[in-house]
Amino acid sequence: MSVTLHTTHGDLKVELFCEAVPKTAENFIALCAAGAYNDTPFHRLIPGFMIQGGDISLGPAANSQGTTPMLPFDDIPKGGTSIYHPSALNQEIHLPALRHNTRGILSMASRPVKNQTAPGSQGATGPTINGSQFFITFAAAPHLDGSSTVFGKVLNLTAEDEGGDVLSKLEKANVKTDKKGKVVQPKENEETEYETLRINRVTIHANPFAT
């Protein structure tokens, strides 16, 4: 199945590997369906490596004055979380089938487990778990194989004005970043040369988990 990320720099259509990583795919699709990714920033950009987003605690879902996304929990913790919160979303590593072997790979940004009894980490089976954050590679990143869950890929990377062109626009965006690649987003109505990097909304083309 596929979804389209409507970003500030164009549309990215991505294929999801639902059969290979069902829990991870279900989490991503459910967050998309709930509107949790709407108006959230790409908060990290490292050209030649990856762009990272999906922190639902940085969007209106966490501080909504209007419609609140239908999520199975009340409060969104800092950094975001999975739909299984307070239980953990464990890694679904599949080597050698699913690897960070090319440009346009969609993968989860994991975080370390510090306390297995803490909300979001309950039931963790490994040293790291997943939440809501994800990244898209700009190049092969084999050092991440075995440590991050690959769950999709950008489609139409060779087509002009489609996935490949948009991914290039995101990679080349004029943004202000710190030494770790964290993007300093321009403030609303601020006059600046720097660009905003954001997911505006998401379109789900087919949801195999819908009931």
Curated annotation (Swiss-Prot):
Enzyme class at the top of the EC tree: isomerase
Alphabetically ordered keywords of this record: Isomerase, Rotamase
GO cellular component: catalytic step 2 spliceosome
One GO BP: protein folding
EC number(s) per entry: 5.2.1.8
Domain PPIase cyclophilin-type as annotated: residue spans: 1-204
InterPro entries found in the cross-reference section: Cyclophilin-like_dom_sf, Cyclophilin-type_PPIase, Cyclophilin-type_PPIase_CS, Cyclophilin-type_PPIase_dom, Cyclophilin_A-like
Described function: PPIases accelerate the folding of proteins. It catalyzes the cis-trans isomerization of proline imidic peptide bonds in oligopeptides.
Protein name: Peptidyl-prolyl cis-trans isomerase-like 3
Organism listed in the record: Emericella nidulans (strain FGSC A4 / ATCC 38163 / CBS 112.46 / NRRL 194 / M139) (Aspergillus nidulans)
Gene transcribed to yield this protein: cyp10
